[in-house]
């Protein structure tokens, strides 16, 4: 105690814990022989909250169940039920392992990193982002195409840990429980079956560099960038408990899987489809580690990704639901933009189907929906702020097909529609 809570000649009272006078604090609470200020009370409450939080983690997992994780994923990601189940179970088990690793020292539970395989625009990145939002842990994304071996032009794999540390506000303890999503992982496949032909600094070399941080190592991370501040102290980050999720479209992998020919049906009534007649996502469901090895991933790298979740192609109905159902659906976003102009935006059901078919034709999946809507609504969003009296804008199938312009409905004369079905 710095100062006893007694009064001086001016009868000034002091906090018995921090020593501040009654004039320096908002409130001073008196006890039988001591005084405590409001700041010390708040500090004590913070300590108690942290203690309660840690005891809660010890008594319970502190993370949602797989069903709860899957339910939240349903709010943001349409379809992909199998991938959601695989991810929910894998993430739940990973954090359950973290919370109980000090209790069960007799059995060491290995980490299960995740590999997401699916066509472009099927929701791989969105699944990883939503998982990080559910679990409230630091999350970072990295592009595998920018990674090179140390010493070559490009990003080192240690930069991934630096980004995760920045997402955790340089809290090393939080960063060591975070999630790293590495996109375009198929782009670092080995360029040739013969590994000794040439130096592959962005393919097999990156796979070798990623092995260390994915399995678990203590990475030395310069918090402000090593080149600009060479004298700074390095932060030590243990990657053992960081969950790595790798995703990629793996274009051409379906041909390797089909060439195995082990998924064909047998019998007179069996319907055997040629590879070109089967959807890519359906073929991906039968992927085996040997297929990934033939694609160009090295055996050690495949071994670090024991959990494989395959995503399916999005059909027309799924794409229509993506446009309207999620909390952050594209149609809802554009309707909100039009509401700011006091205008209601309406899409006909046939128009949504036409947008979905366009995305399927372009083979861009859900990622291409925004660009399609942007091109459809560009002229309307350009003209609308300068128009008066517009109450509603209606988008029909003909508008999506490019044979008509949006229908403008005015507030003063509801029976009049401007900009009607003029040829584009």
From Swiss-Prot:
Q: Which residues are listed for ATP binding in this entry?
A: 119-126
An annotated GO cellular component of this protein is:
HslUV protease complex
Query: Could you list the residue ranges that cross the membrane?
Result: none
**Which terms under GO biological process does the entry name?**
cell division; proteolysis involved in protein catabolic process
Gene3D superfamilies (alphabetical): 1.10.8.60, ClpX chaperone, C4-type zinc finger domain, P-loop containing nucleotide triphosphate hydrolases
The protein's superkingdom reads Bacteria
User: Which Pfam families does UniProt cross-reference here?
Assistant: AAA_2 (PF07724), ClpB_D2-small (PF10431), zf-C4_ClpX (PF06689)
Asked if the keyword Transferase belongs to this entry, the reply reads no
| GO MF terms, alphabetically ordered | ATP binding; ATP hydrolysis activity; ATP-dependent protein folding chaperone; protein dimerization activity; unfolded protein binding; zinc ion binding
Q: Where is the ClpX-type ZB domain?
A: 3-56
Sites where the protein binds Zn(2+):
15, 18, 37, 40
The record's keywords, sorted A to Z, are: ATP-binding, Chaperone, Metal-binding, Nucleotide-binding, Zinc
Tell me, what does this protein do in biology?
ATP-dependent specificity component of the Clp protease. It directs the protease to specific substrates. Can perform chaperone functions in the absence of ClpP.
Q: Per the similarity annotation, which family is this?
A: Belongs to the ClpX chaperone family.
Quaternary structure annotation from Swiss-Prot or TrEMBL: Component of the ClpX-ClpP complex. Forms a hexameric ring that, in the presence of ATP, binds to fourteen ClpP subunits assembled into a disk-like structure with a central cavity, resembling the structure of eukaryotic proteasomes.
Q: What is this protein called?
A: ATP-dependent Clp protease ATP-binding subunit ClpX
**Gene encoding it?**
clpX
């Amino acid at each position: 105690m710095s100062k006893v809570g007694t009064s001086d000649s001016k009868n000034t009272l002091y906090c018995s814990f921090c020593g501040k006078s009654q004039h320096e604090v908002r409130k001073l609470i008196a006890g039988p022989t001591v005084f405590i200020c409001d700041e010390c009370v708040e500090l004590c409450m913070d300590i108690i909250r942290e203690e309660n939080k840690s005891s809660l983690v010890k008594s319970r997992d502190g993370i949602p169940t797989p069903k709860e994780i899957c339910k939240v994923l349903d709010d943001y990601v349409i379809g992909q039920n199998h991938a959601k189940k695989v991810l929910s179970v894998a993430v739940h088990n990973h954090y359950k392992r973290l919370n109980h690793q000090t209790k069960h020292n007799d059995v060491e539970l290995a980490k299960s990193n995740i590999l997401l395989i699916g066509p472009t625009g099927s929701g791989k990145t969105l699944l990883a982002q939503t998982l990080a939002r559910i679990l409230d842990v630091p999350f970072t994304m990295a592009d595998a195409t920018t990674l090179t071996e140390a010493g070559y032009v490009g990003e080192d794999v240690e930069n991934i840990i630096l980004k995760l540390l920045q997402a955790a506000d340089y809290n090393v303890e939080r960063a060591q429980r975070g999630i790293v999503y590495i996109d375009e992982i198929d782009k670092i496949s080995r360029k040739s079956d013969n590994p000794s032909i040439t130096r592959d600094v962005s393919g097999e070399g990156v796979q070798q560099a990623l092995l260390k941080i994915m399995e678990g190592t203590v990475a030395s991370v310069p918090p402000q960038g090593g080149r600009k501040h060479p004298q700074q102290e390095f932060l030590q980050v243990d990657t053992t408990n960081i969950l790595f999720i790798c995703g990629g479209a793996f274009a051409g992998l379906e041909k390797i899987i089909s060439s195995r020919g082990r998924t064909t049906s047998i019998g007179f009534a069996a319907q055997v489809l040629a590879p070109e007649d089967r959807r890519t996502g359906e073929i991906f469901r039968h992927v085996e580690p040997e297929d990934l090895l033939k694609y160009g991933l090295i055996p050690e790298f495949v071994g670090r990704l024991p959990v494989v979740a395959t995503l399916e192609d999005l059909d027309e109905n799924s794409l229509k639901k993506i446009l309207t159902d999620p909390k952050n659906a594209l149609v809802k976003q554009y309707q909100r933009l039009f509401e700011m102009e006091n205008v209601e935006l309406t899409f006909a059901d046939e128009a949504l189907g036409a947008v979905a078919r366009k995305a399927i034709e372009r083979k861009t999946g859900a990622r291409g929906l925004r660009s399609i809507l942007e091109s459809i609504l560009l002229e309307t969003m350009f003209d609308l702020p300068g128009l008066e009296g517009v109450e509603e804008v209606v988008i029909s199938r003909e508008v999506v097909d490019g044979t008509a312009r949006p229908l403008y409905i005015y507030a003063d004369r509801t029976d009049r529609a401007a900009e009607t079905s003029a040829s584009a």
